């Protein structure tokens, strides 16, 4: 193949056929640079550029042709480096917990990985968050001798001090679950300023100490990534390529222990932080959204629905729970605010809705996407491909909410979105959970909900929990089961609604306000529906008599029978097949089987 096309061949093999045109930005007739640096106008593929921007905060670096091939390996094997990072942090956690004073190397891990106040919570909630962001740095460390941008670093070290990447890979091999001696020695050398890459780990150590000491509410991931990136920028001499603000003074906490005094370190590089712009909201936004969805004659059902819809859209309350009767219009309480958010031009909001069962998905997506007011897609698309920049609302089931892949994507939202779309104006909107009482009442599924506790709820602007059957005790227990604080001590009557004050704490640390639209002394919901409570000797026989009578009068009717156990569901379905066309379903069925049953119901 012609030399000038050889690099394109490499990229095409990496980027997967159907996405090549989406990610390549090369001109068609690429000149031959004979293995030298490629000028910045010939941008690297988008995914590689994303990693470069994440680590170095510059859009383009001058890599040679071999560098591109090496960097592309990261995206071909991203899952491997994620798992490698998780495993390294888990080992560090084990060492820090079990042998904190064994040696200087072990103390290094104790300081770097845990910081005593959070050593117990690291393994449960922090490893995957830090591991996801550690993966690119781990990749660079393992390939430090293959990339031209690190040639000066390798050349500056004596032969015996150069990083032996092959030995490092062997030492991190899964077949050696406890031995990480070479990796730990490299980390120890870095901490003791034996090479310039030590700035990265020293910064990480200092930031974690500062976080635990001051109890900062700023997300640790953002702080750690930001200052680590600054160290890379400083070390590579890229300050001129990245617009930073400088200060001539330094805080004592910003001085890394053991750092030699030098005029080169008199300036502190501060990462430019941009606040997300927020367009002003008004009650008129909800009215406009209602007319888009229902037409010009739109009106709210009652004053309560109006005021609660405004509370969800306008107030800063981070977490809201609503109990309302069936048919009241709970969906509109979040549907209209979502349409209003989608109308904002300067900020793109991405929200998520989770329902308890697969059979509810299709109809839910159709309802929420009608009239083209919202772009709706399955959560599975987000889990597999990430945010596409178009979808306003992703809809999934509880299993998706509890999945590790979903929680990992939310944990890395800030970095991935900023680098993918070159803006921080793509923002997480609402997390909406329908029929949330199931977290507490569906005992047989509770083991499946454990992963929800790992979700970073604070990343969302607001969490909304809806139910028709969630009295305070059930609602409070359900919220605590997924890792939230629970309900506020006093549930709010809708008539006590007041505009909430600004909140400085995160969603997960603030109690949820519950609004109860079911009054004990009020008229029974759905009063036009005939209801009978009967005590009988044989419930299945009595139910069969009622069904036979119904279908004799109304042959085209449909009926739903709710049984108390999964075994009874299957027994009734088998015994009644000679009388009716029966479709049965229960919670222990897999998603595929539920989908087949759902099609049968629709048919």
Swiss-Prot record:
Top-rank taxon, per record: Eukaryota
Positions of region (Disordered): 257-281
GO MF: ATP binding; nucleic acid binding
Stored Pfam families: DEAD (PF00270)
UniProt-recorded name of the protein: Uncharacterized protein YHR218W
